[in-house]
């Protein structure tokens, strides 16, 4: 927006610092609004999805997974990174099935979050899924996680008490609370009547 011109930095050049199996790190030289130059180091990311799976009994699908950088087991909503050329919903459908064994008949896009704006361009699309059917998980090699269910009230209590500190799951809990309270509306689509794979998030 034009009123933000006094805040915006202009990219001048880029140096690649690391291209690993998981991380792609670059250093940009930028022109700041005051005319001085500065460097910005950050992670390039293809994007990711998070799935809030709603069971017919009102419970939600969650995972417990060890996160090496944190050196602890985290409670999280199912989530995963976009494959090259993959659209958001197809990724959500794939990740839900692979990690939890659930497939969903109805899907709704909720919104998008940027979890680490200071050092990554990653965004996470938030998807709700309902009318779930449980099948067999298809975990990747080297992927270890437990799937469990909880009530929304239990999840909120864990967020308040500090048992849940994963940022995307905290945001997901906020979305869940507002959707169930009728404050935020979702547009549900029936995957059985009209396959959604191939559609992207708005």
What residue ranges belong to the model's regions?
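Extreme N-terminal tail/first-helix region
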Residues: 1-19, 190, 195-199
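Acidic, metal-coordinating catalytic segment for phosphate/diphosphate chemistry
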Residues: 12-50, 56
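Hydrophobic residues on conserved beta-strands that form the core of alpha/beta folds
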Residues: 25-27, 39, 63, 77, ...
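Short loop segments at secondary-structure junctions
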Residues: 34, 55-57, 66, 129-134, ...
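Unchanged
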Residues: 38, 47-50, 81-167, 186-202
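A glycine-rich, hydrophobic loop/mini-helix early in the fold
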Residues: 46-72, 76-77
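Charged phosphate-binding loop/patch that engages nucleotide di/tri-phosphates or the phosphate backbone
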Residues: 172-190, 194
